[in-house]
């Protein structure tokens, strides 16, 4: 995906029972059709469990078969014709890419494995293709109210909330360390990480949000479609989706919520908008990421790393659907035949994919007003020669020839990061005589960010090579 702007292709599915009504909209045109599947049908109930099993026993053929059936059920008649026209606009570069916005008004339809969608004509696993983004939306104003403003001042704040896990299953400290590592590469003046850990209650969470005013709330813990497990008077208890929504309604700074909690992304049937993620969208949150299946701890940590690396340090900062696409692609490449890439679900409460924009001027003015003492320390000067040799070593020691087909994006990412690093070294070499220059400081921060990204891609390439 070369640019940061996607065209919307909207799919609305409504009705109380099959066949459901389908309306597709693109570029001022619309098409109507019908849709038969829902999660109550035996074959789709079984499909849900088949996808779950692939996370233990890899089965790419099963994933493609399920996604292909779902795609064929959706793309029929006039709806298919409109999709072919939209896809042609991408292939002929009239638009940069497409955002498939799924407005699924029946909980029984919403519970289908939409993230498995597979275009059999083009052999495309839709959720991970670089030209497409897959999101869930809601268009009924009675369900979802006004959107929040996207602009935030620097530093952007992330609150990581990780309640104590008495089972010991969740490695929250490792995930927090990964998040801090990514943010450290961006620099303290751009992003800050706050933590809330231990046996905290919903009241503690509300107070912490009110105090630090985060842009992103990242939750690490247990949950289900009806709520998240927090603590109350020394006991772990399920905090309802309604209680969480109430806190979010009083937290205007929060633009995005990441729920690394198994099953928090499943719709709570049969009533619409009863689940955790959906209630947070009703509270006005711009984007909510939640898990619709149980997810292994290592996969969840990798996904978070991929997502934040792209959302905050990628080519299109603040564009959540593009970051989601990149993160899913990372999981898809690292875990072949495993539906982990389809476990995270993105609900988007915006017309486009932008959940926040950074007010750089306001951030700089705020920093200046606080005085020199509050500024983060200037990073030490880089040894350009040493870094240049390190890049050469990375290129020499990384095999790329086997990265073809669906894995070609890894080769492209690796080479693009190498080019960016070499370009930054040339700029830093020219600025070396002015290490106190703010431009030099920014370039050093950029260099470190791309260096961390290159190391991450190299690790992913090594994982793919081992699994080949």
Whereabouts are the PLM-identified features?
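Non-catalytic, solvent-exposed interaction/assembly segments
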Residues: 1-124, 129, 152
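Short, polar/flexible loop-turn hinges at active-site or ligand-entry regions and domain interfaces
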Residues: 55-58, 167, 311-316
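Short helix/loop capping segments that flank catalytic or ligand/cofactor-binding pockets
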Residues: 109-117, 169-171, 267-268, 356-357
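Caspase-like cysteine protease fold
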Residues: 128-142, 207, 211, 237-252, ...
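Catalytic cores of nucleophile-dependent amide-cleaving enzymes
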Residues: 132-141, 216-306, 311
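Solvent-exposed, amphipathic alpha-helical segments
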Residues: 302-314, 326, 330, 420, ...
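Long, low-complexity or tandemly repetitive, helically biased scaffold regions used
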Residues: 382-468
